[in-house]
């Protein structure tokens, strides 16, 4: 199993063989999570601190559950009650926590690059749970696992990513991962929500939903991220749904066996028709939630193995 990373800060740092290693290990954790006894000792004796500077339900609870199932001591830092609210900087907070000798820091932050900066200042492994518009690596990995289990492969597929591309770290991480794994990627969005220069990733750009979905194996919808918008990017939610919301009529242009994905939380009737989101024959949205726990277990397991090996080498060096 190949995984060389000291931290997991983005998909950009991973080679295809490392991506496959994460997915293969995550597959085994899917099996474990379906058992009555859902326990491993992979992180036994280790401390995991979750630092979420943005609100999160799915991701934070998924990381917490993943750590506990691996046997870690898990602490959720309540940012609203922390010294950050009293003016303490991110680095001061990180250095304070670093002095307590944690083994894993799971960090979500509204500023792109904040997690990379933090990782350069601490002695433990750092896992990016989403930073601004930059990256959300575990979301892309769990999406890849969901696709592989549904389609039998994660190569040579046509994947359409639709919606708020401009503000989405999920889109960016998926675009990078799918490209590394030799897939054909299409981005579908109104011009106001298509970031400049995104075509450099080798993807196809569309502002017509039906044309973009034609022959797609996978349809990945994205949430409208109003909290990151500082202007009028769409005329109205009603008009947006009419042109870019996924319904049965638009999905008919994709392959007959195309799967429907959404990272959540969903705005039903805006990004996707509620009936379609719940269609067990097409939607794999709940599978994504399940795969999220397994993928995060795999990522933390692999980072912990590398951390233990690094500490072991350091200890030998001290003895010598």
Swiss-Prot record:
Carbamoyl phosphate binds at residues 58-59, 108, 136, 139, 264-265. It catalyses: carbamoyl phosphate + L-aspartate = N-carbamoyl-L-aspartate + phosphate + H(+). Its EC number is 2.1.3.2. Keywords: Pyrimidine biosynthesis, Transferase. The keyword DNA-binding does not apply. L-aspartate binds at residues 86, 169, 223. One of its GO terms (cellular component) is cytosol. GO terms for biological process: 'de novo' pyrimidine nucleobase biosynthetic process; 'de novo' UMP biosynthetic process; amino acid metabolic process. GO terms for molecular function: amino acid binding; aspartate carbamoyltransferase activity. Pathway: Pyrimidine metabolism; UMP biosynthesis via de novo pathway; (S)-dihydroorotate from bicarbonate: step 2/3. It is an enzyme of class 2 (transferase). Belongs to the aspartate/ornithine carbamoyltransferase superfamily. ATCase family. PANTHER family: ASPARTATE CARBAMOYLTRANSFERASE, ORNITHINE CARBAMOYLTRANSFERASE, MITOCHONDRIAL. Heterododecamer (2C3:3R2) of six catalytic PyrB chains organized as two trimers (C3), and six regulatory PyrI chains organized as three dimers (R2). Catalyzes the condensation of carbamoyl phosphate and aspartate to form carbamoyl aspartate and inorganic phosphate, the committed step in the de novo pyrimidine nucleotide biosynthesis pathway. This is Aspartate carbamoyltransferase catalytic subunit.
């Amino acid at each position: 199993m190949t995984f060389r990373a000291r931290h997991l800060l983005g998909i950009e740092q991973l080679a295809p063989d490392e991506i496959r290693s994460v997915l293969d290990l995550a597959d085994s954790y899917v099996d474990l999570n379906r058992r009555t006894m859902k326990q491993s000792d992979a992180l036994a004796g280790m401390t995991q601190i979750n630092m979420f500077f943005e609100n999160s339900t799915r991701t934070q609870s998924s990381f917490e559950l993943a750590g506990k199932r691996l046997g870690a001591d898990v602490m959720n830092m309540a940012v609203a009650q922390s010294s950050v609210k009293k003016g303490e900087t991110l680095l001061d907070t990180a250095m304070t926590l670093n002095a307590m000798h944690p083994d894993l820091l799971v960090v979500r932050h509204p500023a792109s690059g904040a997690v990379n900066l933090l990782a350069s200042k601490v002695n433990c492994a750092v896992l990016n749970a989403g930073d601004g518009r930059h990256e959300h690596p575990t979301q892309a990995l769990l999406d890849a696992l969901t696709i592989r289990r549904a389609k039998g492969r994660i190569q040579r597929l046509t994947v359409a990513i639709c919606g708020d591309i401009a503000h989405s770290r999920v889109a960016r991480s998926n675009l990078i991962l799918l490209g590394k794994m030799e897939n054909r990627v299409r981005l579908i969005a109104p011009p106001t929500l298509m970031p400049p220069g995104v075509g450099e990733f080798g993807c196809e750009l569309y502002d017509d939903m039906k044309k973009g979905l034609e022959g797609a194996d996978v349809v990945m919808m994205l949430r409208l991220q109003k909290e990151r918008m500082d202007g009028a990017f769409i005329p109205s939610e009603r008009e947006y749904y009419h042109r870019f919301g996924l319904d049965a009529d638009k999905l008919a242009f994709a392959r007959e066996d195309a799967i429907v994905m959404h990272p959540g939380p969903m705005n039903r009737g805006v990004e996707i028709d509620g009936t379609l989101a719940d269609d067990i024959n097409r939607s794999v949205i709940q599978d994504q939630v399940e795969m999220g726990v397994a993928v995060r277990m795999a990522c933390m397991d692999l980072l912990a193995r590398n951390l233990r090996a690094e500490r072991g080498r350091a200890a030998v060096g001290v003895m010598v």
